[in-house]
Regions:
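Solvent-exposed alpha-helices and their adjacent loops that cap or buttress functional pockets
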Residues: 7-12, 31-41, 59-63, 158-160, ...
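Fold-independent oxyanion-binding glycine-rich loops
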Residues: 3, 20-22, 45-48, 72-73, ...
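Detector for the Zn2+-coordinating histidines of canonical Cys2His2
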Residues: 227
């Protein structure tokens, strides 16, 4: 937001953004209202909440009766988030807890929120493997449309689809584990990813591929992660 704001202020004509940002609460709503939903709680990403705050989550927690715990990204942060979520489930509670107070406030970052409101506007967004979720994305507002690469370079018609064998959408919704997908670790690896959850190093499939906590697929059997696979995920040099 600040980059395109500065580009407009400076009158730059060689700067463009291809915006694909998403909003978390509408995605949670879509997951929780699906008939096959199995999700019992959420760990809310601390870096998102450091900007957006936590005010959007209490209504979701109450409506769907699930705990929402804001966490950081260090191992202890994540473990603490899981611990707090499990304790809520054990007590039959469903509320928002902030386990990342060193970075997250309820009101978020007011200056950043004002910038977001000026530069972006909310739109419906297609999620790979899931489909279209209303009000779940952002695009540049009319005032900044000249910097929108989708508008400027006429790429709106470009569409990509995941192969039928890829079950990343089900992984994203918590319906299956990565190792339940027949492509996992065979045709789908971090070097040859088929879906969003393997493309990103933060994705569930990429994490399973690296740490290999399950052994119920041919690719997962064995005594550990081969050195070649470790090098794929952790390149040196």
């Amino acid at each position: 937001a600040m980059a395109v704001h500065q580009a407009r202020r400076l009158g730059l004509d060689n700067f463009s953004l291809l915006v694909s940002h998403v909003r978390v609460p509408p995605a949670i709503e879509a997951i929780m209202t699906a008939p096959e939903c199995r999700v019992q709680g959420f760990l809310a990403a601390g870096h998102v909440c450091s900007v957006m705050g936590t005010a959007e989550y209490p209504d979701l927690a109450d409506k769907h009766r699930v705990p929402v715990v804001v966490t950081g990204f260090e191992p202890l942060d994540i473990l603490e988030g899981i611990r707090l979520a499990v304790h809520q489930l054990e007590r039959g509670e469903h509320r928002v807890e902030n386990a990342y107070p060193r970075a997250v406030r309820e009101q978020g970052n007011p200056a950043a929120l004002r910038m977001l409101e000026e530069v972006f506007e909310v739109i419906d967004r297609n999620w790979r493997g899931i489909g279209r979720i209303p009000a779940s994305g952002w695009r540049l507002s009319d005032a900044y449309r000249a910097y929108d690469a989708e508008h400027r370079f006429d790429v709106a018609g470009i569409r990509t689809e995941e192969p039928a064998v890829c079950r990343a959408g089900e992984v994203l919704q918590g319906l299956i584990k990565p190792t339940e997908c027949e492509a996992f670790g065979t045709s789908c690896t971090p070097r040859t990813p088929l879906g969003a959850t393997m493309v990103s190093s933060e994705g569930a499939c990429a994490a399973y591929y690296l740490y290999r906590r399950m052994n119920n697929t041919p690719a997962a059997r064995g005594s550990g992660v081969p050195q070649s696979q470790q090098e794929e995920m952790n390149p040196v040099g």
